Curated annotation (Swiss-Prot):
Function of the protein: Required for the formation of N(7)-methylguanine at position 46 (m7G46) in tRNA. In the complex, it is required to stabilize and induce conformational changes of the catalytic subunit.
PROSITE patterns, per database record: WD_REPEATS_2, WD_REPEATS_REGION
UniProtKB keywords: Nucleus, Repeat, tRNA processing, WD repeat
GO biological process: tRNA (guanine-N7)-methylation
Record-given protein name: tRNA (guanine-N(7)-)-methyltransferase non-catalytic subunit TRM82
Known pathway: tRNA modification; N(7)-methylguanine-tRNA biosynthesis
InterPro entries: Trm82, WD40/YVTN_repeat-like_dom_sf, WD40_repeat_dom_sf, WD40_rpt
Length: 453
């Protein structure tokens, strides 16, 4: 029996009125109508890019390069008996994965909204591109207008946008960072025309853009436990490194209520709070005891790294977010149902547990909403066993009691809208249980003995 694919990511504008979600290779947009409490579909975009076509272009390009190289070396072409050159005319062969090869997924990643809330950004695995959509709220047919699709040499792992919303900064899986002006023309010859603005020697996992005293900075995190702070756009000037992590860093954020603070998390079993201006670690919050009751068989280490008892479990923070205008952070450990909310004492910069919330299914993504009326978190869930229920939960702060709670009625309305949008059996996001895209990739960043040899 087919099911609607779980939501991989969900983000909203500050008021929470506009919601954008990713299901498989589809982005869908909704508007919350406060008069009747319903969610109205505002637009939809499906990534229809053909990976085969991209591979074919690469094969043709390589064939042309080899022919040119052969001519340069003086290698003779095949000729007829009359001495005429035989032109080989055939289509480029597209490599086909052999038996047992892992499936290829056309994921959409890194969903985010620009600071002025007029653009939606994402990354497409199909052609390793950054997608820029204009959000046309007055367009009743489809509010998502693709205005730029820029492929990159390697797959983007993380993106951010500068405060003026003019430049996207891209960190890829091979350790390179690029910048892209949104209004610049699309670059076709990406291997020759794109130059990294900075680099690491390992896979990049996060990137941020910020300013301090009129100076611009870009912050990057990687698999090698590093956080690097560089000037921007003079990114060859390294301001400092933040050392303290012993495992990979998977998530970094800067709170809007104090831009001198940076919070980081990953394979270590703690949340790190930094004064990045001074390069000092201010505090570390150990969450081990909080999450241990929620660690399960999904966290068993790979067989080749298991202990003799076969009970070694490994876990890591998947994503960490800061609630605007309030000294709160929220995070979750990959493949768990537990959302942990921390509060920061702004006089001592010490973190303490504010609240734990247990969700009905494993959390896959978290983002925030916050304006003068309401604030809280958008949570997407791995609901594959739910019978097409509980795709998303909205969690809001009650300022009177200073506690967070799930907005069940509003969450149910959104989930109903998802079902209505994708209920047809031929829907692109309908899959079998074993066809669900991989949702838990963070712990694969962990290094074992083989990585240090």
């Amino acid at each position: 029996m087919s099911l609607i694919h779980p939501i991989q990511a969900v983000v909203s504008n500050r008021s929470g009125e506009l919601i954008f979600a990713v299901l498989k290779n589809v982005i869908i947009a909704y508007r919350y109508d406060q008069t009747n409490g319903k969610y109205l579909e505002m637009g939809k975009w499906e990534d229809q890019f053909s990976r085969d076509e991209m591979i074919k272009i690469a094969v043709v390009k390589e064939q042309a390069r080899q022919l040119a190289e052969n001519e340069e070396k003086g290698i003779k072409k095949s000729k007829t008996n009359e001495g005429n050159t035989i032109e080989k005319k055939h289509d480029a062969k597209i490599p086909v994965p052999g038996p047992g090869a892992p499936p290829i997924y056309s994921q959409i990643r890194n969903l985010m909204i620009s600071n002025d809330e007029t653009m939606l950004l994402a990354c497409a695995d199909s052609d390793k591109s950054v997608l820029v959509f204009k959000i046309e709220t007055l367009n009743n047919d489809n509010c998502l207008k693709l205005i730029k699709r820029q492929p990159f040499p390697k797959r983007p792992n993380a993106i951010t946008i500068t405060e003026d919303d003019k430049t996207v900064i891209i960190a890829d899986k091979f350790g390179d960072v690029y910048s892209m002006l949104i209004e610049s023309p699309v670059i076709e010859n990406i291997d020759e025309e794109f130059e990294p603005i900075l680099g690491h020697v390992s896979m990049l996992t996060g990137v941020l853009s910020t300013t301090n005293n009129g100076m611009k900075f870009v912050m990057t995190s990687d698999r090698d436990e590093h956080i690097k702070i560089s000037h921007f756009p003079q990114s060859y000037i390294v301001d400092k490194w933040l050392f303290g992590h012993k495992e990979f860093v998977s998530s970094i954020c800067i709170p809007s209520w104090n831009s001198n603070i940076l919070v980081s998390a990953g394979g270590d079993h703690g949340i790190f709070l930094w004064d990045w201006i001074k390069g000092e670690k201010l505090d570390e919050f150990d969450f081990t005891d909080l999450v241990l009751p929620y660690i399960n068989e999904n966290h068993l280490a790979p067989d080749r790294f298991q202990n003799e008892e076969n009970d070694l479990k490994e876990f890591a923070v998947s994503k960490l977010v800061s609630l605007p205008n309030n000294p709160y952070f929220a995070f979750f450990v990959e493949a768990t149902k537990l959302l942990i909310i921390l509060e920061v004492d702004q006089s001592t910069y010490k973190m303490k547990l504010l609240q734990k919330i247990v969700l009905p299914y494993y959390i896959t993504f978290i983002s925030t909403f916050s304006d003068d009326k309401t604030m809280g978190f958008n949570i997407s869930l791995d609901n594959r066993e739910s019978g097409d229920k509980d795709f998303v939960k909205f969690i809001a702060l009650d300022t009177t009691s200073n506690t967070f709670s799930i907005k069940e009625e509003q969450s149910d309305e959104f989930n109903t809208s998802i079902v209505n949008s994708f209920s047809k059996e031929d829907s692109i996001v309908k899959v079998e249980l074993d066809e669900v895209y991989p949702l838990y990739n963070i712990i694969s960043l962990k290094k074992h003995g083989e990585h240090y040899s």
